[in-house]
Amino acid sequence: MATLQATNILTGTTEGAKYNATGSTSEIWTVATTTALASGDTISGPVIPANTYLVDVLVSWTDVDSGSGATFECGYTGTLGAFIATGNTTPASGGIVHANVAGALGYTATTNTTVLVTMTGTAGTPVAGTCRIGVIYTASP
């Protein structure tokens, strides 16, 4: 299993949690997938700050599989499919998927939470590409 680290699309670095006391905060992180993604590989993305409320998680893929085997889920340590359900096929064709699991909207935790994208199926015919992970959260629900 490989672990990839996404970086903030604006700064090119990994960053800790941050939020705006009013309104909402949006972040987009990106990672190049130059090698074949296999089932169990994980991409570490943005951090949802403690005591904030999740509005949405978005994951965008270029077509990283000219076959049809690449699937993923999105969540956090201990609950990897908390935001986007296990087996999503977007990496096999490219596109964008939003949070689609009950309880994702309004998710909150008492500690900073790193968003994780985990492959649940291996690419049949791997293609180098890009995965972008976006989060939107607010301090006031």
Regions found by a protein language model. Name each.
Residues 2-141:
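Surface-exposed, low-hydrophobicity beta-strand/loop segments enriched in small/polar/acidic residues
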